[in-house]
UniProtKB/Swiss-Prot annotation:
Role: Endonucleolytically cleaves ssRNA generating a 3'-OH and (presumably) a 5'-phosphate group. Cleaves preferentially at U residues, has no activity on dsRNA or dsDNA. Upon expression in E.coli contributes to the degradation of small RNA (sRNA) RhyB.
Phenotype of gene-disrupted mutants: No visible phenotype, no effect on sporulation. A quintuple ribonuclease deletion mutant (pnp, rph, rnr, yhaM, yloC) is viable.
Alphabetized NCBIfam families for the sequence: YicC/YloC family endoribonuclease
Alphabetic keyword roster: Endonuclease, Hydrolase, Nuclease
Protein name: Endoribonuclease YloC
EC nos: 3.1.26.-
Residue ranges crossing the lipid bilayer per the database entry: none
Originating gene: yloC
Any GO molecular function: RNA endonuclease activity, producing 5'-phosphomonoesters
Protein family: Belongs to the YicC/YloC family.
InterPro entries: YicC-like_C, YicC-like_N, YicC/YloC-like
Cofactor names: a divalent metal cation
Length: 291
């Protein structure tokens, strides 16, 4: 199955007092990579979560977003500096006595004092939460892969359409190439007749045409193009992560088309080569999206 490298998948899971959601977005990338964004208390869990995603992906950059609605991410603990609080209380009583104040110290005011009362948060490992996140990640990556496969089918269909167009252009080029030398001979003959009244040296004309025929022969390029078309179809049919192979073939297609354009020395073939390069460029754009 051909896959695109772009896609999206998401999933949410709830169990008891735990609620998690996972989102995955993938874009084109030469290799495979996961950029994770998790709540800070879950950073220890990042590598395991990445591996869960990567085992389903061959190429592409994945953006992973995890959100958790739970009080179980951290363990909160209240700490009171009793010796320091004793000093504050003693100071409050001294102030009351010194200034003959009637009000008693408000206990809640002591909670506002720096360093007296502090809340410490400690990261905790929760197996139930981890399992829930993995479950959501598995469902999200399944949705991501399904979308990538649907887009992959469209990419493959579009590529094959352009391959069909290229094959037709190559057939037309092959037909024109068979008459390139005769057309050149006619042009050369007419040009010489225009320039001179002398009798033509037929052997010289034949020699010039032979040199031109050798220089403009595109038989090998056409044969290789046909071979590349067949390989392209076979690779698409094989499925899997074939993006790199197809990218290499596209480069070869472009190289052969350029060679034909430089060798043919015929305006009709040149027009066909321009159309070939346009189709090849469209294939290249699609192949860059294939995993």
């Amino acid at each position: 199955m051909i896959r695109s490298m772009t896609g999206f998948g998401s999933a949410s899971k709830t169990q008891d007092d735990l609620s998690v959601s996972v989102e995955l977005k993938s874009v084109n990338y030469r290799f495979k990579e996961v950029n994770a964004r998790l709540p800070r208390p879950l950073l220890y869990f990042e590598d395991k979560l990445k591996q869960t995603i990567l085992q389903h992906i061959q190429r592409g950059r994945i953006e992973l977003f995890v959100s958790v609605d739970s009080d179980m991410l951290v363990e909160k603990r209240l700490e009171i500096d009793w010796p320091l609080l004793d000093e504050f209380v003693a100071a409050a009583r001294d102030m009351k006595k010194r200034y003959q104040l009637s009000a008693e110290p408000d206990v809640m005011d002591f909670f506002k004092l720096d360093h007296v009362v502090q809340v410490h948060e400690e990261q905790t490992q929760n197996d139930k939460l981890e399992a829930l996140i993995i479950d959501a990640a598995e469902e999200a990556v399944k949705g991501l892969c399904e979308m990538r496969e649907k887009e992959g089918l469209l990419l493959a269909k579009d590529c094959l359409m352009h391959i069909d167009q290229l094959e037709e252009l190559v057939r037309e080029t092959e037909l024109l190439a068979a008459d390139v030398v005769s057309r050149y001979r006619e042009r050369l003959y007419a040009r010489i007749k225009e320039w001179t009244e002398d009798v033509l040296d037929e052997s010289r004309l034949v020699t010039e045409c032979a040199i031109f025929a050798d220089r403009s022969d595109i038989t090998e390029e056409i044969t290789r193009l046909k071979s590349h078309f067949a390989q392209f179809r076979d690779i698409l049919a094989s499925g899997g992560a074939v993006g790199r192979k197809l990218d290499f073939l596209v480069q070869e297609l472009n190289r052969e088309a350029n060679t034909i354009g430089s060798k043919a020395n015929d305006h009709q073939i040149t027009k066909l080569v321009v159309e070939m390069k346009s189709s090849i460029e469209k294939i290249k754009e699609q192949v860059q999206n294939i995993e």
